[in-house]
Amino acid sequence: MNKNYDYIIYTDGAYSMKNDEGSFAYVMLDGQMNYIKHFSKKIVHETNNRAELKAIIAAIYHLPEGAKYIKVVSDSQYALNTLSGKMGRNANLDLFDIYDDILSRHDYEIEYEWVRGHSGNEYNELCDKLCNDVLGYDANAEFEKYKGYKRNGKR
């Protein structure tokens, strides 16, 4: 895979069966780790796996025109393994159909990378904060310090 990524996308999803609500979020960076945009959304009547998948699908859908080399970073082994084809797709087939349809319309080369959740990875933590924020927790103040952030050459 080409290590000169056009975009690096960090994603996260969360779901509480107790409250029957959850959220998903992504943070999109350019290949030099400069902030491009973020997105988060509340969902209901879903599952944690669906939240994780929706985060990745939303990010891929919102890639700017001309993108080719993409890195997707997630703490969901389920999402990464099913989307990359390392694991069979037995559930959530509607979401896989959407993902496959998006990919069929573009010439993306996607690398999938797993990161341990809640391990201090700044962008994974930021996605987690965005998920919490959309559910009513205040993560906006925390996000402001990351806006425009550039990390020199580290990926």
Residue locations for each model-derived region?
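RNase H-like nuclease fold core
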Residues: 2-50, 61-63, 68, 155
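Short, conserved alpha-helix that lines the donor NDP-sugar binding/gating region
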Residues: 52, 56
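Structural motif
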Residues: 1-2, 105
